[in-house]
């Protein structure tokens, strides 16, 4: 779960780094806790600075602290077997460096490098992207490619670390179209190809024999996976009430026979001149991987068949509710000469509640402090 959250955060940041035109400095704090008493605290520093008229520099620094309680049979988190009766804690650090260069008034190219490291996991990525505006800037095309090399580690009983390798190649094509002065349509296609060690070294699968006795063995996934996603989003500004609303749909499928549907909507509203309210809801549903079983027999091991203990590969539905408040500090800057540096600054507080049909739930709290230049 922790790696999933970190991956999502990274992809969101990487996408923002690609083509942002605004100079800013921001500090973000995330807190995640789930129904198994696992928790992740993240602190991030983001900088976007214009070096020349058409050149932007980006820097992202992030530190995660992970806490997993002692194994008691109730937690679904993965962790080393070593000292399993004691809490497990570890840290993860990441850095993203990026440069965006304007070629002309309508074309930008960008390159980013990502490095992440923790005790038993290391990841490096190179990301390249290009965007171009057309038809009087009413249409925007974007292409992005990424290569990632991961070193997956397993902490053994004696404290040594066994490592496995995997790599990922991904690409994205997106188009944004202004339909009217108040409506924008976005369409995109994503392709992701994984190769190498795609299991979790800590997850164990129960194997039952004819007498209903069981033993645990390591899960075994295929060493390749090809994933596709098609998504569309429409955003509309409600001028009479100074608000906006958006809705998007995403269809996903892969060669493990997993398919999913995601529907999401967001409402944004100026409550006061300096206060913005955002409400978000997301529904997700997916089918199971072809090799997922609720109960595995010993024939699976004897035949060398694939097996998994990953709950994310079974059928389930999930719901996510979000609420955020953003307070713009421009009013304070206007009233105080000594605080004019806050003219483009804001404070944002976010809360997300997640739950699914697998009896799992989580709370995420996020605080952002942003300084614009």
Please identify what each model-predicted range represents.
Residues 78-87, 200-233, 253-257, 261-264, ...:
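Outer membrane beta-barrel transmembrane domains
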Residues 29-33, 63-67, 113-119, 132-134, ...:
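Transmembrane beta-strands of outer-membrane beta-barrel pores
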Residues 34, 38, 58-98, 140-198, ...:
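Outer-membrane beta-barrel translocator/channel fold
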Residues 23-27, 57-59, 109-111, 139-143, ...:
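Transmembrane beta-strands of outer-membrane beta-barrel proteins
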Residues 45-49, 97-101, 128-132, 173-177, ...:
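Residues on the lipid-exposed face of transmembrane beta-strands in outer-membrane beta-barrel proteins
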Residues 20, 52-54, 104-106, 135-137, ...:
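Outer-membrane beta-barrel channels and translocator barrels
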Residues 20-60, 364:
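Short glycine/proline- and aromatic-enriched beta-strand/turn motifs that initiate or cap beta-hairpins
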Residues 30-33, 81-85, 112-116, 129, ...:
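Extracellular loop and loop/strand-boundary signature of outer-membrane beta-barrel proteins
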């Amino acid at each position: 779960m922790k790696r999933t959250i970190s991956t999502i955060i990274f992809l969101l940041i990487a996408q923002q780094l690609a083509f942002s035109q605004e100079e800013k400095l921001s500090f973000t704090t995330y807190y995640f806790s789930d129904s198994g008493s696992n928790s992740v605290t993240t602190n991030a520093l983001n900088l976007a600075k214009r070096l020349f008229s058409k050149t932007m520099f980006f820097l992202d620094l992030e530190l995660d602290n992970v806490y997993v309680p002692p194994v008691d049979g109730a937690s679904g988190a993965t962790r080393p077997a070593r000292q399993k009766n004691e809490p497990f804690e570890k840290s993860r650090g990441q850095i993203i460096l990026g440069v965006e260069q304007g070629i002309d008034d309508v074309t930008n190219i960008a390159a980013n490098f990502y490095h992440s490291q923790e005790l038993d996991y290391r990841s490096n990525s190179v990301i390249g992207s290009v965007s171009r505006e057309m038809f009087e800037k009413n249409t925007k095309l974007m292409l992005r490619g990424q290569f990632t090399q991961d070193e997956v580690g397993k902490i053994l009983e004696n404290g040594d670390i066994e490592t496995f390798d995997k790599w990922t190649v991904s690409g994205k094509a997106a188009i944004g179209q202004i339909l009217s002065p108040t409506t924008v349509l976005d369409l995109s296609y994503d392709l992701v190809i994984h190769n190498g060690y795609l299991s979790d070294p800590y997850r164990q699968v129960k194997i039952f024999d004819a007498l209903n006795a069981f033993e645990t063995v390591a899960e075994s996934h295929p060493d390749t996976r090809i994933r596709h996603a098609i998504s569309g989003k429409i955003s509309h500004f409600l001028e009479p009430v100074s608000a906006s609303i958006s809705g998007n749909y995403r269809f996903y499928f892969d060669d493990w026979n997993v398919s999913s549907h995601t529907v999401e909507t967001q409402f944004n509203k100026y409550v006061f001149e300096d206060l913005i309210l955002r409400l978000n809801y997301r529904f997700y549903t997916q089918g199971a991987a072809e090799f997922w079983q609720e109960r595995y027999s010993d024939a699976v091991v004897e035949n060398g068949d694939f097996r998994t203990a990953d709950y994310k590969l079974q059928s389930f539905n999930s719901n996510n509710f979000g609420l955020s408040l953003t307070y713009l500090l421009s009013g304070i800057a206007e009233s105080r000469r000594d605080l004019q540096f806050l003219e483009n600054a804001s404070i944002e507080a976010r809360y997300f509640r997640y739950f699914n049909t697998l009896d799992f739930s989580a709370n995420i709290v996020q605080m952002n402090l942003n300084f614009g230049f």
